[in-house]
């Protein structure tokens, strides 16, 4: 299978690494584009919008699949736009999609929006993100609220990590409150040029009566979570209490850089351990810190789990740890509370279903405090 058109490969080669990174320019391979159309099924749109069309890979596919549809592409880079026009066969508008406007509503909005964080000082819209805005989320939100027809479908290739970022909850909540999640199909391996970010095929439409998505589940607190394995997660958590229902504190730790100057030998008087990710995941040797370091100290008992990293698979593990004093690094999460509650948690965490639940829930490779609260308690 030819993954990219020649024009895209040549254009990609001409871009510097900085241009690709700053602009989030990573073209979608054919095998993933095919999955998008597979998930759309027999949907027949009258008009189609690709909001950040690049060199027009999706537009070329749409022209073959939807022969009678009107297709519009919007692209900020005139060089990409010229390639997307393909000898004037396609209607391509050179414009920043975020400031582009039209009264037309579209039956299908399709594409792979760029993914990059806005620079420091950018004034974010609190109805879109909490902070640290990302162009990908802005494009998604604008498509939903300004351009999607009432009976339309939005089909995009998006990073799986957007689903559990606390920064993007305003837009994710908009989706769970007003939209049907038709697909959130995770792509385990991909052939993107220049990036290995984990992605999903994400398809939504405006809420329809009686629709039940296999890509969402409702927590014990009533929150709806979107996940590629939503159906299985819902069955695991059904009827169970969760960590969030127990009287515990959930804490992150400190960065290694902030504590590095306080490292000492464990024989040093008053020193105490720093528990790192590897001490839980790989049972590595402990580091020790001088008693001159006083921030975020724990004393007594805690259940410690790896926070993980935003890539790869999340692998759950835990240690039931007790010491007079200790601190944890920021890739570790501490759960503290009364011994009787920690006994319940330790027993539950030893259950194989906890490992499965966390692996499926943490599809982006790491776990948040909010997700820790959703871990079911097994008796």
Swiss-Prot record:
Please give the start and end residues of each transmembrane region. none
Documented EC number(s):
2.1.1.72
- Please name the GO terms that the record assigns under molecular function: DNA binding; N-methyltransferase activity; site-specific DNA-methyltransferase (adenine-specific) activity
GO BP terms: namely: DNA restriction-modification system; methylation
Keywords for this protein:
DNA-binding, Methyltransferase, Restriction system, S-adenosyl-L-methionine, Transferase
Leader sequence residues? none
- Catalytic activity, per the record? a 2'-deoxyadenosine in DNA + S-adenosyl-L-methionine = an N(6)-methyl-2'-deoxyadenosine in DNA + S-adenosyl-L-homocysteine + H(+)
For whether the record's keyword set contains Nucleotide-binding, the answer is: no
Q: Which InterPro entries match?
A: DNA_methylase_A-5 (IPR003356), DNA_methylase_N6_adenine_CS (IPR002052), N4_N6_ade-DNA_methylase (IPR050953), SAM-dependent_MTases_sf (IPR029063)
Q: What class of enzyme is it?
A: transferase
Q: Which CDD domains match?
A: AdoMet_MTases
**What does the sequence similarity comment in the record state about its family?**
Belongs to the N(4)/N(6)-methyltransferase family.
Query: Mind telling me which PANTHER family this protein's record contains?
Result: DNA METHYLTRANSFERASE A, DNA METHYLTRANSFERASE YEEA-RELATED
Q: What is this protein called?
A: Type II methyltransferase M.CvrRI
| Gene that this polypeptide is encoded by | CVIRIM
């Amino acid at each position: 299978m030819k993954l990219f058109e020649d024009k895209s490969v040549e254009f990609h080669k001409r871009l510097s690494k900085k241009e690709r990174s700053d602009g989030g320019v990573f073209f979608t391979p054919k095998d993933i584009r095919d999955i998008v159309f597979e998930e759309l099924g027999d949907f027949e749109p009258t008009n189609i919008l690709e909001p950040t069309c690049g060199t027009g890979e999706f537009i070329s596919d749409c022209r073959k699949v939807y022969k009678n549809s009107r297709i519009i592409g919007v692209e900020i880079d005139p060089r990409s736009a010229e390639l997307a026009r393909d000898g004037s066969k396609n209607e391509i508008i050179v414009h920043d999609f975020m400031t582009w406007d039209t009264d037309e509503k579209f039956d299908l909005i399709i594409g792979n929006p760029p993914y990059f964080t806005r620079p420091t000082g950018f004034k974010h819209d609190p109805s879109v993100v909490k902070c640290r805005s990302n162009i990908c989320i802005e494009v998604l939100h604008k498509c939903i609220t300004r351009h999607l027809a009432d009976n339309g479908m939005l089909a995009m290739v998006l990073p799986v990590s957007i689903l559990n970022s606390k920064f993007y909850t305003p837009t994710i909540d908009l989706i769970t409150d007003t939209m049907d999640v038709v697909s959130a199909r995770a792509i385990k391996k991909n052939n993107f040029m220049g990036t290995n970010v984990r992605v999903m095929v994400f398809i939504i439409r405006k809420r329809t009566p009686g629709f039940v998505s296999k890509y969402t589940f409702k927590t014990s607190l009533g929150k709806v979570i979107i996940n590629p394995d939503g159906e299985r997660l819902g069955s695991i958590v059904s009827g169970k209490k969760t960590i969030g229902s127990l009287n515990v504190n959930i804490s992150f730790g400190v960065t290694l850089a902030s504590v590095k100057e306080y490292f000492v030998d464990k024989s040093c008087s008053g020193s105490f351990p720093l528990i790192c990710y590897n001490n839980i995941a790989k049972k590595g040797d402990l580091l020790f810190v001088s008693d001159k370091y006083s921030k975020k100290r724990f004393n007594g008992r805690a259940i410690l789990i790896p926070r993980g990293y935003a890539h790869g698979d999340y692998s759950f593990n835990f240690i039931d740890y007790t010491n007079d004093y200790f601190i944890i690094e920021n890739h570790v999460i501490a759960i503290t509370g009364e011994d009787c509650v920690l006994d319940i948690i330790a027993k539950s965490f030893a259950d194989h279903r906890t490992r499965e639940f966390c692996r499926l829930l943490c599809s982006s490779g790491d776990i948040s405090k909010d997700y820790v609260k959703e871990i079911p308690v097994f008796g």
